[in-house]
């Protein structure tokens, strides 16, 4: 994959004419975009607030397949433009379905067939050895949604493509009649789904709080004593008093029992 964008190609022989003439630059831009897109890297010219700026990113080819015999034959559906900014935005440019494609999609929907899409996992590699990620929906849901779908590109934490998914709105098949004009243009929303980092344990804060508690205990050693160590001088007298009271009660009960037995023997 070639490195850099069009911004790095302005120092060539065209710089004196292309940059010096705004209209010449606008005419030459599509040719330069096509050359860059073939290498997987592309830049786009944006106009806003009276100023022009470039947005560089990656061009991913989106392909689809829907065949009557349930075979797989992917053909180009459009292109995904993946910006290289920190926001990781993504947009899509798609082809219009031909009359033959619309008729074939209807036939496949009637046969309860599948509609498949795929995008490449890596750039700068020939199609013969490239790897793809794929997804599919029922062709009937694609028809009854009037080609309204949502495509999500899943990436790892480094931004590498690891999967793709597609859903339609609505996603059910109810046998509704669909006009031919509703199957001409795709109405697609695209997203990038990156992994959400797990919550990091607050180890430093926990250690700091633990050290503060230990320092506080060192200043107040009295707080470290147990309940018995703090109040033993009150507990022991109470225990001794209870023990002595119990022994005295037991002696009185024994004396009363002996006297009663002696009286019974005198009769």
Swiss-Prot record:
Keyword Signal: yes
Transmembrane parts of this sequence: 227-247
GO BP terms in the entry: protein insertion into ER membrane by stop-transfer membrane-anchor sequence; tail-anchored membrane protein insertion into ER membrane
Compartment(s) of residence: Endoplasmic reticulum membrane
Superkingdom of the organism of origin: Eukaryota
Membrane topology: Single-pass type I membrane protein
Stretches in topological domain Cytoplasmic: 248-267
Leader peptide range in chain numbering: 1-38
Keywords on record: Endoplasmic reticulum, Membrane, Signal, Transmembrane, Transmembrane helix
Pfam families named in the record: ECM10
GO CC entries: EMC complex; endoplasmic reticulum membrane; membrane
Keyword Transmembrane in annotation: yes
Subunit structure: Component of the ER membrane protein complex (EMC).
Role this protein plays: Part of the endoplasmic reticulum membrane protein complex (EMC) that enables the energy-independent insertion into endoplasmic reticulum membranes of newly synthesized membrane proteins. Preferentially accommodates proteins with transmembrane domains that are weakly hydrophobic or contain destabilizing features such as charged and aromatic residues. Involved in the cotranslational insertion of multi-pass membrane proteins in which stop-transfer membrane-anchor sequences become ER membrane spanning helices.
PANTHER family assigned to the protein according to its UniProt record, in alphabetical order: CHROMATIN COMPLEXES SUBUNIT BAP18-RELATED, ER MEMBRANE PROTEIN COMPLEX SUBUNIT 10
Family: Belongs to the EMC10 family.
Protein name, per record: ER membrane protein complex subunit 10
Organism per entry: Xenopus laevis
Gene that specifies this protein: emc10
């Amino acid at each position: 994959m070639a490195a850099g964008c069009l911004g790095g190609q302005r120092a060539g022989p065209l710089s004196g004419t292309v940059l010096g003439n705004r209209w010449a630059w606008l005419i030459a831009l599509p040719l330069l975009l096509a050359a860059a897109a073939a290498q997987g890297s592309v830049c786009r010219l944006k106009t806003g607030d009276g100023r022009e700026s470039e947005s560089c990113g990656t061009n991913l080819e989106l392909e689809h397949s829907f065949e009557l015999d349930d075979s797989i034959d992917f053909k180009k559906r459009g292109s995904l433009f993946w910006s290289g900014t920190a926001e990781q935005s993504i947009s899509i440019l798609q082809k219009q379905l031909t009359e033959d494609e619309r008729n074939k999609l209807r036939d496949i929907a009637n046969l309860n067939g599948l509609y498949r899409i795929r995008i490449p996992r890596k750039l700068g590699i020939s199609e013969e050895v490239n790897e793809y990620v794929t997804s599919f929906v029922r062709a009937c849901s694609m028809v009854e949604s009037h080609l309204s779908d949502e495509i999500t590109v899943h990436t790892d934490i480094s931004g590498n493509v690891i999967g793709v998914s597609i859903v339609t709105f609505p996603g059910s098949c109810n046998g509704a009649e669909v006009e031919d004009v509703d199957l001409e243009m795709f109405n697609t929303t695209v997203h990038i789904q990156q992994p959400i980092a797990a919550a990091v344990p607050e180890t430093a804060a926990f250690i700091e709080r633990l050290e503060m508690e230990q320092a506080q205990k060192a200043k107040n050693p009295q707080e470290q004593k147990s309940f018995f160590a703090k109040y033993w001088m009150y507990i022991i007298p109470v225990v001794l008093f209870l023990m002595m009271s119990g022994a005295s009660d037991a002696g009185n009960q024994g004396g009363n029992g002996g006297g009663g037995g002696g009286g019974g023997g005198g009769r």
